[in-house]
Amino acid sequence: MSDVDDTIVDSIAIVGAILIGIFLIVVSVSNTSLFNNTEYDSMINSVLVIISSVIAYTLGKRRSKS
């Protein structure tokens, strides 16, 4: 039962990270004035690195169990 719970949690983490990334991209595209703000660009880059880390960690954890 623990494997099923881990799979559900991992799936939620990956889907959530992807949705947050998509939301940030949509906000950036719809509001072009944000592209001129270097602080916002730095924040977006940091958040995308965190999202990538979550996905990589989750997929790596699943791979090491197999």
UniProtKB/Swiss-Prot annotation:
GO CC terms? host cell membrane; membrane
Q: Give residue spans on the Cytoplasmic membrane side.
A: 1-6, 61-66
The places in or outside the cell where this protein is found are: Host membrane
Membrane topology field: Multi-pass membrane protein
- Tell me where the signal peptide lies: none
TM spans, by residue? 7-27, 40-60
What ranges are annotated Extracellular (topological domains)? 28-39
Keyword annotations for this protein, in alphabetical order, are: Host membrane, Membrane, Transmembrane, Transmembrane helix
Lineage: superkingdom: Viruses
> This protein is called what?
Putative transmembrane protein ORF66
